[in-house]
Amino acid sequence: MDLQSTYDRIATHFSETREYAWPEVESFLADRQGDRGLDVGCGNGRHTELLAEHASQAVGVDLSRALLDEATSRARERGFAATAAFVHGDAAALPLRTGTMDLAVYVATLHHLSPRAARIESLNELARVLRPEGVGLVSAWSTAHDRFDRTEGFDTTVDWTLPGGETVPRYYHIYAPEEFEADLAESDLVVVDTEVSSGNCYAVVRAERNHGG
């Protein structure tokens, strides 16, 4: 199941259903400012738009070129194109220089990566691009979500239904909260805080090197 082609197929309809930033992201950014902000797995740019209000320059990275087109259109239509750039790239191999980001948002994307090594490598990449004083927010779907009746992490597919009725399967790794914390602990990130909210695991993180690691 190819992640890029999956989201290229559903990009237009997906974007139509993703208008507003998540409240957890709004809370994370509320009292923070920086020169550069990063949105990993930016989709249609809804969180990049919010980052652009808290950083002088926001960068959105996504594997789907069709979603990047949606994000570019959103930025132009909503007036934040001058302070946002959208780049094609993989969360596990970010096309960005080391130590350049003050703020980062990596939400609703980690759970699409497979296998586990790719998920951890993406966390390492987030650590790599954060500046020494940088801070990020990571989220993933969790077993705490109402739709799941499991306590241990597992792989699954969740169908996306297009307007004509066609279904497109999407890969997910559903994290148990303890497993989410374990993967973060194995990465080059340091966890500042964690919580489970609206069926998602969240972590506020910094780069390990900032703490002498």
PLM regions and their residue ranges:
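Class I (Rossmann-like) S-adenosyl-L-methionine-dependent methyltransferase catalytic domain
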Residues: 1-33, 44-92, 135-213
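Conserved S-adenosyl-L-methionine
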Residues: 41
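Short conserved loop adjoining the S-adenosyl-L-methionine
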Residues: 93-98
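A conserved beta-strand element that flanks and buttresses the S-adenosyl-L-methionine
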Residues: 105
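Short catalytic micro-motifs in class I SAM-dependent methyltransferases
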Residues: 108-112, 140
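A short glycine-rich, Lys/Arg-flanked "PGG" loop and its adjoining helix->strand segment in the class I
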Residues: 120-132
